[in-house]
Amino acid sequence: MVICNAIIVLLLAFNTLANPILPSSPNATIVGGQKAKAGECPYQISLQSSSHFCGGTILDEYWILTAAHCVNGQTASKLSIRYNSLKHASGGEKLSVAQIYQHEKYDSWTIDNDIALIKLQSPMTLDQKNAKSVQLPSQGSDVKVGDKVRVSGWGYLKEGSYSLPSDMYRVDIDIVAREQCNKLYEEAGATITDNMICGGNVADGGVDSCQGDSGGPVVDVASNQIVGIVSWGYGCARKGYPGVYTRVGSFIDWIDSKRSQ
């Protein structure tokens, strides 16, 4: 998720912001959550260069869904993924990346269209307890206010931390109205587009994704569908600023077109 220490900074009105709004950095974690148990988030992968820097979601044996800002400037030959493990640095299996597909209209300024696909060189072995694909929603589908979604990853456990947990964490959060979220972020100079969804505890804060969780899954608990991708926010779990996620339902046609190539 993009936060104060993220790589991509929206230089929106420097004098009006105490802290800049940023895409979730490649080193974020879950705030206010708990350690994931075996089988709870089997679709989660760790995207790695020399080590973990972003999350991703298993779509099938060859394809991974992640955030565009995670792969911005990256070269496929230097990337790998680890799957089938609750730890980002050990266990499971590592596979090399064959190709990166970043959305053509990704905007690093507004962080709109923050979605990318990764194709692997060799297939994953799925249908294991910690290695399963997730379902995609239909094109144009949207979340509803109050829907419960699960966010997972290896990001920082609190804002300002500089140490990644070795274990995967997860947290369940509620979807916040897009209109309400936009009003909150307008004051900070940012815009919530129709390609974004928001989630968290607006009144009290305390639960959110953070640096290092970027690119990871936001899954509807009831349907087990991937409805969001960890994208950006103002700090981590701050009161009055829910996390912002890519709305996957806006991009199903794009996903299908890339996977059919």
UniProtKB/Swiss-Prot annotation:
Enzyme class: hydrolase
Disulfide bonds: C54-C70, C181-C198, C210-C236
The EC number(s) this enzyme carries: 3.4.21.-
Active-site feature positions: H69, D114, S214
Swiss-Prot/TrEMBL keywords: Allergen, Disulfide bond, Hydrolase, Protease, Secreted, Serine protease, Signal, Zymogen
InterPro entries: Peptidase_S1_PA, Peptidase_S1_PA_chymotrypsin, Peptidase_S1A, Trypsin_dom, TRYPSIN_HIS, TRYPSIN_SER
Keyword Phosphoprotein: no
Site residues (Required for specificity), renumbered to this chain: D208
Span of domain Peptidase S1: 30-260
Keyword Signal among UniProt keywords: yes
Signal peptide from the UniProt entry: 1-18
One GO MF term: serine-type endopeptidase activity
Propeptide stretch(es), residue numbers: 19-29
Family: Belongs to the peptidase S1 family.
Protein's recorded name: Mite allergen Eur m 3
Gene from which this protein is expressed: EURM3
